[in-house]
């Protein structure tokens, strides 16, 4: 199990990312627009730098929903590899079967 403080920190970052997502997308679109002038891009860059660091989606970490494990997480299920295997072996995930060839 991951420490609760680490898991809660990631959840707090997720809320911050969602809060600033629209504003961030608007600013980034100005920066990526080839037709915008240099002054507009400079002011957009300043606005982007004034946003909180945790508003960047890069700072998020995928974690297992059950254990909080940061590595080996299958994003389709939101579970770590260990818990995914345990749940799949019990047959609790419809359509998921063990591979055999």
Curated annotation (Swiss-Prot):
The keyword rRNA-binding applies. GO terms for molecular function: rRNA binding; structural constituent of ribosome. One of its GO terms (biological process) is translation. InterPro entries: Ribosomal_uS14, Ribosomal_uS14_bac/plastid. GO terms for cellular component: cytoplasm; small ribosomal subunit. The keyword Ribonucleoprotein applies. Pfam families: Ribosomal_S14 (PF00253). Keywords: Ribonucleoprotein, Ribosomal protein, RNA-binding, rRNA-binding. Binds 16S rRNA, required for the assembly of 30S particles and may also be responsible for determining the conformation of the 16S rRNA at the A site. Part of the 30S ribosomal subunit. Contacts proteins S3 and S10. Belongs to the universal ribosomal protein uS14 family. PANTHER family: 30S RIBOSOMAL PROTEIN S14 (PTHR19836), SMALL RIBOSOMAL SUBUNIT PROTEIN US14M (PTHR19836:SF19). This is Small ribosomal subunit protein uS14. It comes from Nitrosomonas europaea (strain ATCC 19718 / CIP 103999 / KCTC 2705 / NBRC 14298).
């Amino acid at each position: 199990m991951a420490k609760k403080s680490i898991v809660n920190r990631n959840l707090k970052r997720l809320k911050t990312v969602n809060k600033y997502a629209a504003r961030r997308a608007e600013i980034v679109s100005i920066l990526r627009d080839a037709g915008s002038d240099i002054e507009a891009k400079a002011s957009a860059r300043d606005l982007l730098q004034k946003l909180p660091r945790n508003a960047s989606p890069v700072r998020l970490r995928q974690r297992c929903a059950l254990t909080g494990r940061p590595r080996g997480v299958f994003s389709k299920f939101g579970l770590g590899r260990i818990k995914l295997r345990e749940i799949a072996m019990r047959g609790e995930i419809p359509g998921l079967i063990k591979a055999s060839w």
